[in-house]
Amino acid sequence: GMTGVVLGASRPDGRLDEWMLSALIAEAEGMDITLHRCFDLTPDKAAALETAIDLGFSRILTSGGATRAPDAAETLATLIAQAGPRITIMPGAGISPATLPALAHLPLREVHASCSMAQPVTDAVAAMGFGPPERRITDETTVRALCAALARL
């Protein structure tokens, strides 16, 4: 079975929807629970972090509120310091072997990266306009390079 899930729910103003998240977490009882990047839309990340802890999340997947996590290294540092050992801050979005050095000064425990590359779609569905002209696939070379870069941190 599954050992973990990634969940998220926001209110119209961007705050975490505590009621919905509580209900989802109850359904995921016994699993490792990660708060997804809806966290990046919250107007007060410090308060949202405390809410995530109170709700029982074990980690927060976040770009630090930026399009790419490496562009928000200082925000991530602040979140990691606030979190301490209570919850893991897992940077994600724009993580690659080339961008990892921007986060090297952080006490990271985990990162999230797609390690993907664009691949053209050549089937009839795409040709007829029923799908995107390309898809993203995991690139083994990028995965290996990221693992090597992480080992050097």
Regions found by a protein language model. Name each.
Residues T3-D17, D32-P43, L49-E50, S58-P70, ...:
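Catalytic beta/alpha-barrel core
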Residues E29, E50, D54, G65-A66, ...:
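Hydrophobic/basic alpha-helical segments enriched in Actinobacteria
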Residues G1-G4, L24-M31, A52-L55, P97-L100:
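Short charge-dense sequence patches
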Residues G1-P12, F57-A72, L106-E134:
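Glycine-rich phosphate-binding active-site loops on the catalytic face of alpha/beta enzymes
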Residues D13-C38, D71-P97, P132-L153:
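Alpha-helix-loop-beta-strand connector modules within alpha/beta enzyme cores
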Residues W19, D40-L55, T78-P91, I95-A113:
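Catalytic cores of alpha/beta
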